[in-house]
């Protein structure tokens, strides 16, 4: 199904300057969804602002993977009450995964009756229509689709970078890990047609983009439900043939579905970067079984070993949860041992967060908070130790770096990433932004590298 761009023309901003503000919580999928919301609004004539106080439209794109993300949304909504009282014409909209949870929309409208629009993950493309109804009819709009819809192509998108871009290749998840709400709020797996993906990337490349990251809750499941038989590895090889594309990445991979065909594609394809995000979640077989992950520690380690054999320069990142129900000290030590054996270059570490309507929420032996926090701190220390070792090994080497922009911490420095995703800061002129440059690493920091440009 194609987005109706002509409908936007009919509901454009006609008079004056109108600003919108979007705050995004959660993952890269949410980031891309927010880029689409921004794209639709800018197509209507609105302008984006980073100052929430001057906005006439405030949107919170929410996440529900962890309780902390939900609490941040509630806190921000509470702080909007005064702004709404000062400006009754302010329109407040909520969308994203949190809204898909059973009863959540009604709870929000009960606690925060000044919210104007609530919609979910399956109908974000209809936001301009909801906005128009609020503006013209003065109604409150709540519309949550229980079932996933046909994939909508051609939604305007406002990219936040001119160098690299996210491209979603599939939506939803069929795995039902016992701690996770994603299958309930994002729906079942469904894939975009390969030609739609290729056309989007070709357009991005023609506009100067150098790096593409393919997104999906489980990219290795790509191809299910399509008329054309195609695997994720085959898609990667097709995209690798696109002229002008410099780099290609993907996330997220489920270890049980990452095939050797994908590993060989990374090895063989010159544009595929030597970096894999491979969430392990736990190093304990008992906990992995309770999580419903469908692999064990030995299988994960064998996969990591095989990947390193085929792609010597590869770096791994991962997701790890501590404090899952029933996790013993011995289980946790197995996780620490796995972290030391694999030696990750980055890790997203989390304290287990109970989620309503998930099997893990009903499990016995919930872990006390003080134990969870102690294990979390020890895990972070073990992960960081491995990161430092990896960074030290980069000293003295020369890497190809894609210059992404100026450093967040020092606008006089440039920043970019190597093919294997190491962050490098270095001196250089802003004309280098968007270009590939050779950089020699002169110092390893805890979470980044310091380099100097080698003569081009």
From Swiss-Prot:
The keyword Chaperone does not apply. GO terms for cellular component: cytosol. CDD domains: Radical_SAM. Keywords: 4Fe-4S, Cytoplasm, Iron, Iron-sulfur, Metal-binding, S-adenosyl-L-methionine, Transferase, tRNA processing. NCBIfam families: miaB-methiolase, MiaB/RimO family radical SAM methylthiotransferase. Belongs to the methylthiotransferase family. MiaB subfamily. This is tRNA-2-methylthio-N(6)-dimethylallyladenosine synthase. It comes from Clostridium botulinum (strain Alaska E43 / Type E3). The gene is miaB.
């Amino acid at each position: 199904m194609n987005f109706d761009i002509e409908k936007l023309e009919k509901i454009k901003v006609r008079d004056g300057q109108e600003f919108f503000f979007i705050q995004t919580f959660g993952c890269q999928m949410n980031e891309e969804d927010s880029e689409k919301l921004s794209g639709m609004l800018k197509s209507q004539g609105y302008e984006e602002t980073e100052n929430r106080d001057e906005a006439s439209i405030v949107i919170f794109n929410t996440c529900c993977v962890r309780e902390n993300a939900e609490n941040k949304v509630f806190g921000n909504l509470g702080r909007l009450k005064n702004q709404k009282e000062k400006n009754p014409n302010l329109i407040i909209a909520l969308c994203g995964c949190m809204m898909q949870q059973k009863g959540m929309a009604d709870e929000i409208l009960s606690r925060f009756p000044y919210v104007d629009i609530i919609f979910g993950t399956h109908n974000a493309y209809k936001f301009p229509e909801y906005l128009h109804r609020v503006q013209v009819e003065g109604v409150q709009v709540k519309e949550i689709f229980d079932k996933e819809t046909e994939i909508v192509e051609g939604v305007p998108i406002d990219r936040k970078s001119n160098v690299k871009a996210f491209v979603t290749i599939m939506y939803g998840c069929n795995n039902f890990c016992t701690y996770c709400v994603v299958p309930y709020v994002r729906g079942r797996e469904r894939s975009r047609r390969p030609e739609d993906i290729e056309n989007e990337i070709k357009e991005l490349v023609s506009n100067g983009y150098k790096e593409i990251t393919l997104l999906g809750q489980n990219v290795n499941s790509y191809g299910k439900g399509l008329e054309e038989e195609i695997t994720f590895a085959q898609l990667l090889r097709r995209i690798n043939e696109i002229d002008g594309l410099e780099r290609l990445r993907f996330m997220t991979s489920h270890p049980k579905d990452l095939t050797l065909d994908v590993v060989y594609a990374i090895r063989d394809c010159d544009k595929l970067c030597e970096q894999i995000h491979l969430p392990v979640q736990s190093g304990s077989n008992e906990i992995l079984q309770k999580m419903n992950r469908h692999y064990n520690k030995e299988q994960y380690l064998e996969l990591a070993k095989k990947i390193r054999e085929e792609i010597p320069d590869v770096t791994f990142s991962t997701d790890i949860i501590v404090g899952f129900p029933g996790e013993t000290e011995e289980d946790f030590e197995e996780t620490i041992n796995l972290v030391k054996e694999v030696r990750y270059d980055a890790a997203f570490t989390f304290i287990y967060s109970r989620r309503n309507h998930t099997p893990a929420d009903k499990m016995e032996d919930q872990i006390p908070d003080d134990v969870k926090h102690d294990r979390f701190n020890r895990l972070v220390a073990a992960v960081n130790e491995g990161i430092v070792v990896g960074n030290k090994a980069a000293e003295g080497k020369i890497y190809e770096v894609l210059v992404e922009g100026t450093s967040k911490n020092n606008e006089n420095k440039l920043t970019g990433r190597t093919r294997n995703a190491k962050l490098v800061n270095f001196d250089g002129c802003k004309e280098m932004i968007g270009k590939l440059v050779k950089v020699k690493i002169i110092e390893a920091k805890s979470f980044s590298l310091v380099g100097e440009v080698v003569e081009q």
